[in-house]
């Protein structure tokens, strides 16, 4: 009775339960389809073939069915790299779909070749795409095979596709406003951006560039620059585009790594693009490719060791072993050349072709002479600032001093040099260099100073105390501008630090920090203007006059600061200097007793200091630290790139003489001017056509040289690409290691090998056909178990192989083997040595088959045993051998001559087997486990047992075969 009143208590903290069910149910596969896919997964060729044959007759299996992962039989075969089953499926016209894309993504080269060569027979019924299940489609509609292959960067697959003459859509320009781009963006902006990203990801593939581009280095340069610019427009995919841009830069650098001689390096760096307009086509040894690399900011390419070694050789031309000399010797040499630069310049003016004239044209000598000239200019600026020549300070328009007259030629030389540089390189290239902008500002200030001094000298002749001059007096403005230009001139010397390996990275870091300061100033100015407006609005009403202040001084520069926030400009100055602690707190006080106003003003002033000092200033320090660390992490590349730009400015023709000698016309200049004037204004008649023939000859020679240079360049590029591809494949194999795919491939190979050997030895039974239901199969398996062997019923489906009777012919070298003696129980030592003897046994089995190769026909179609039967009855093979030994008495009645195995009928063998002690045959169905995991584990266990049994049988067969006895053997493995 107590149980009637007993109530079970649920101690679970969550007593309510949520019923779960499958909301998006999918179509379940039939048992036959599961068995079909399972056979493809295991690599059972015979079963798959029989299933396909019966599907064509009975239509009981959908050969295009998919597993829960959305994989069809063809995709499973591709994933397992089972090309035999793939070919079998294609021969039966399975639906291909995205199989080619799937094979490309899995990088199965054999499958890609098979699918590319596959052509559906004419007249076959095509499976409509709409009837296939597209819910598992893994590829967007814009993905093509060549694009996917380029994404994987598989050289072999890309080569196969390029040989088929595939194409890739050409992406439009970054800011293209054509109808196609605008309409595509309006319809689906995400798809438009993704499609553009996929195209560029394919175009940036190193393997595709190496295969399809005539000039892969130039292609990588332009594509990397375009991707960098695109990352600034497509901010949503900025990281992806920057990664692709870096990939192109590394490809060009790696391609240059493969150069093995100075000749190859010179051919690469001196090659010029035929379509390049900014380079002179008459120059063939001006490092044109390197100039293009600098233009596109290919820092990795420029800083590559091979490139730097060639540049160093050209830079120190005429100074062999310069780097191995002591630093004292180097310093004395540079100082000597620097002091002699006026004489070298004069020698070049007189005779440019002389030894001294050619000596000053060397890049290193040119650099030393220009540096010495600039240092001389700075020294004269120092003399001018110290006022060595005493003048009357009260003269409103003073005449130029001797030092100022000496400075004037240098200023004119600087201006003339900048004009020539802008003329040669173009305005766009000129303004992209920040040092050129600094030179422009410096020269402008010097011109303004000279102009104002001339105005003051002409307009103001008298002398007047300086305290009485007006604020905007030309002399005062000229002196202020001259002081600013002196600062810029001194800072311009920092650009020469790039030539030094220690000061160069610091100079680059300083330039990067200036960008951070500009970014910081934008935010700081906004905060400054906001608080200046508020404080000025608050204290505008309390402005006092100067006569009311001590010493008649008004402003924050007085001994006692006052009226700090009376005007907007004064407020801006006060807040700026407060950052440096130069403003006192009492400036927030007012003469009237308005304590609330003072409190609000002090609070606003304190809040500004907190924001500007604690927040913004620390943010600036963090930004500058980040910039310095970024440069420090890539200091070598950044410095070498900046040094190369400095060196290249001295490699070019022209600009040989330093200021002020560059403003002196040389005889060569007069000769060029005379030729131009003669050809322009006094053209001569050419009745005989000599000039025309001369121009034609020069044009032909120039084009011939260009063709020869291009041919040499293509040969070098071909060699570089071959070396790069070989190195890429070698590195990929080295760094790949063992992955899960390798183990899956090994498992698939073992499974396929097992089924092939079973078919070869005839150890597989006739499975039942599809018409047998799964219940009947289980019942028949239970009846075949014999006495008491209780087997668990499992739902399984079998395929009828339908093999015909065939006879197997073999040489009469194998006699009947005697009954093996010894206990059948295996010790622990034997079980521990299973795997060690499996390898030699398989080798012996292969040797035995090779001996039969000339006489053995196709295996007989005896009933084949299943995998599960082999697992349960492992002693079946030994019992067959025992059965063959019992037939020894019958075989002795036969003659000792050669007896072929084909003379023994299958019925006689079966009758002899029934009269012997051989047990009942195993079940004749090939069970396909519904669980993939359980079937895989059973597969490995059964493979180990079968290998063990084969090994022992092969040892005994080889032993008897070696004795040379000739007797018939009838075995059934």
Swiss-Prot record:
One of its GO terms (molecular function) is clathrin binding. Residues 971-973 are annotated as: Essential for binding to NHERF1 PDZ domain. Disulfide bonds join 553-558. Zn(2+) binds at residues 172, 176, 178, 181. It holds the Pfam family TRP_2. Ca(2+) binds at residues 418, 421, 436, 439. Keywords: ANK repeat, Calcium, Calcium channel, Calcium transport, Cell membrane, Disease variant, Disulfide bond, Glycoprotein, Ion channel, Ion transport, Membrane, Metal-binding, Repeat, Transmembrane, Transmembrane helix, Transport, Zinc. InterPro entries: Ankyrin_rpt (IPR002110), Ankyrin_rpt-contain_sf (IPR036770), Ion_trans_dom (IPR005821), TRP_dom (IPR013555), TRPC5_channel (IPR005461), TRPC_channel (IPR002153). GO terms for biological process: calcium ion transmembrane transport; calcium ion transport; negative regulation of dendrite morphogenesis; nervous system development; neuron apoptotic process; neuron differentiation; phosphatidylserine exposure on apoptotic cell surface; positive regulation of axon extension. It catalyses: Ca(2+)(in) = Ca(2+)(out). Residues 766-794, 810-837 are annotated as: Disordered. The keyword ATP-binding does not apply. Glycans are attached at residue 461. NCBIfam families: trp (TIGR00870). Forms a receptor-activated non-selective calcium permeant cation channel. Mediates calcium-dependent phosphatidylserine externalization and apoptosis in neurons via its association with PLSCR1. Acts on distinct neuronal populations in the hypothalamus to regulate innate behaviors including feeding, anxiety (flight/fight/fear), socialization, and maternal care. It is linked to Loss-of-function variants in TRPC5 may be involved in a mental disorder characterized by maladaptive behavior, anxiety, autism, postpartum depression, extreme food-seeking and hoarding behavior, hyperphagia and obesity. This is Short transient receptor potential channel 5. The lineage of its organism: Eukaryota, Metazoa, Chordata, Craniata, Vertebrata. The gene is TRPC5.
């Amino acid at each position: 009775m107590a149980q009637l009143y007993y109530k079970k208590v649920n101690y679970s903290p969550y007593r309510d339960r949520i019923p779960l069910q499958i909301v998006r149910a999918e179509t379940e596969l039939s048992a036959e389809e599961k068995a079909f896919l399972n056979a493809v997964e295991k690599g059972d060729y015979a079963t798959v073939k029989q299933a396909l044959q019966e599907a064509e007759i009975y239509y009981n299996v959908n050969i295009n069915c998919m597993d829960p992962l959305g994989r069809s039989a063809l995709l499973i075969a591709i994933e397992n790299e089972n090309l035999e089953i793939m070919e079998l499926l294609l021969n039966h016209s399975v639906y291909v779909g995205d199989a080619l894309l799937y094979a490309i993504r899995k990088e199965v080269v054999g499958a890609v070749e098979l699918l590319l060569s596959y052509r559906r027979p004419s007249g076959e019924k095509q499976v409509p795409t709409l009837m296939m299940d597209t819910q598992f489609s893994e590829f967007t509609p814009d993905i093509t095979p060549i694009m996917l292959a380029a994404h994987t960067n598989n050289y072999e697959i890309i080569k196969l596709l390029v040989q088929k003459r595939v194409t890739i859509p050409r992406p439009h320009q970054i800011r293209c406003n054509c109808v196609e781009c605008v309409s595509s963006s309006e319809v689906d902006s995400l798809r438009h951006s993704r499609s553009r990203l996929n195209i560029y990801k394919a175009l940036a593939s190193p393997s595709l560039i190496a295969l399809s581009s005539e000039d892969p280095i130039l292609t990588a340069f332009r594509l990397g620059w375009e991707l960098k610019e695109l990352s600034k427009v497509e901010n949503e995919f900025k990281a992806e585009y920057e990664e692709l841009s870096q990939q192109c830069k590394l490809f060009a650098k790696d391609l240059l790594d493969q150069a093995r001689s100075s000749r190859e390096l010179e051919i690469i760096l001196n090659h010029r693009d035929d379509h390049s307009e900014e380079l002179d086509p008459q120059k063939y040894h001006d490092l044109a490719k390197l100039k293009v690399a600098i233009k596109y900011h290919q820092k990795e390419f420029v800083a590559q060791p091979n490139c730097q070694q060639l540049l160093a050789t050209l830079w120190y031309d005429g100074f062999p072993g310069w780097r191995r000399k002591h630093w004292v010797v180097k310093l004395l040499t540079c100082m000597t050349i620097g002091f002699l630069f006026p004489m070298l310049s004069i020698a070049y003016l007189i005779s440019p072709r002389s030894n001294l004239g050619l000596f000053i044209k060397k890049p290193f000598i040119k650099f030393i002479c220009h540096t010495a000239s600039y240092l001389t200019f700075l020294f004269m600026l120092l003399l001018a600032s110290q006022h060595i020549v005493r003048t009357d300070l009260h003269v409103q328009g003073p005449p130029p001093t001797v030092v100022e007259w000496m400075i004037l030629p240098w200023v004119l030389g600087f201006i003339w040099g900048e004009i020539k540089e802008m003329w040669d390189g173009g305005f766009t290239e000129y303004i992209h260099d920040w040092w050129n902008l600094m030179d422009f500002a410096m020269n402008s200030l010097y011109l303004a100073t000279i102009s104002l001094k001339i105005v003051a000298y002409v307009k103001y002749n008298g002398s007047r105390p300086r305290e009485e001059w007006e604020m905007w007096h030309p002399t005062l403005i000229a002196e202020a501008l001259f002081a600013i230009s002196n600062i810029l001139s001194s800072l311009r010397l920092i650009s020469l630090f790039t030539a030094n390996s220690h000061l160069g990275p610091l100079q680059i870091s300083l330039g990067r920090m200036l960008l951070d300061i500009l970014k910081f100033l934008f935010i700081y100015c906004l905060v400054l203007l906001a608080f200046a407006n508020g404080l000025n609005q608050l204290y505008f009403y309390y402005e006092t006059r100067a006569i009311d202040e001590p010493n008649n001084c008004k402003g924050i520069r007085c001994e006692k600061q006052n009226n700090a926030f009376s005007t907007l400009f004064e407020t801006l100055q006060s807040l700026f200097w407060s950052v440096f602690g130069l403003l006192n707190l009492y400036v927030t006080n007012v003469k009237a007793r308005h304590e609330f106003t003072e409190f609000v003003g002090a609070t606003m002033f304190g809040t500004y200091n907190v924001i500007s000092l604690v927040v913004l200033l620390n943010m600036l320090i963090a930004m500058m630290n980040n910039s310095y660390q970024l440069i420090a992490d890539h200091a070598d590349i950044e410095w070498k790139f900046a040094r190369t730009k400095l060196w290249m400015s001295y490699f070019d023709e022209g600009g040989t003489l330093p200021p002020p000698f560059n403003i002196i016309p040389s005889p060569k200049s007069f000769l060029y001017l005379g030729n131009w004037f003669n050809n322009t204004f006094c053209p001569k008649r050419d009745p005989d056509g000599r000039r025309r023939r001369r121009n034609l000859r020069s044009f032909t020679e120039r084009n011939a040289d260009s063709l020869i240079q291009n041919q040499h360049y293509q040969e070098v590029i071909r060699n570089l690409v071959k070396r790069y591809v070989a190195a890429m494949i070698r590195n990929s194999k080295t760094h790949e290691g063992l992955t899960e795919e390798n183990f899956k491939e090994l498992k698939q190979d073992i499974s396929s090998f097992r089924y092939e050997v079973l078919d070869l030895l005839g150890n597989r039974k006739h499975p039942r056909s599809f018409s047998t239901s799964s219940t009947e199969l289980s019942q028949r398996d239970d009846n075949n178990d014999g006495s008491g062997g209780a087997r668990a019923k499992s739902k399984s489906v079998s395929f009828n192989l339908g093999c015909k009777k065939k006879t197997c012919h073999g040489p009469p070298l194998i006699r009947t083997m005697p009954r093996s003696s010894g206990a059948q129980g295996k010790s622990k030592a034997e079980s521990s040595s299973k795997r060690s003897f499996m390898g030699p046994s398989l080798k012996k089995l292969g040797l035995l088959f090779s001996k039969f190769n000339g006489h053995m026909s196709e295996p007989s179609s005896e009933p084949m045993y299943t995998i599960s039967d082999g697992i349960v009855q492992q002693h079946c093979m030994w019992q067959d051998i025992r059965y063959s030994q019992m037939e020894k008495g019958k075989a002795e009645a036969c003659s000792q001559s050669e007896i072929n195995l084909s003379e023994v009928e299958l019925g006689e063998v079966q009758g002899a087997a029934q009269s012997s002690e051989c047990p009942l045959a195993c079940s004749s169905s090939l069970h396909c486990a519904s669980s993939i995991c359980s079937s895989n584990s059973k597969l490995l266990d059964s493979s180990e047992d079968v290998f063990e049994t084969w090994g022992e049988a092969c040892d005994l067969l080889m032993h008897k075969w070696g004795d040379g006895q000739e007797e018939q053997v009838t075995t059934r493995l």
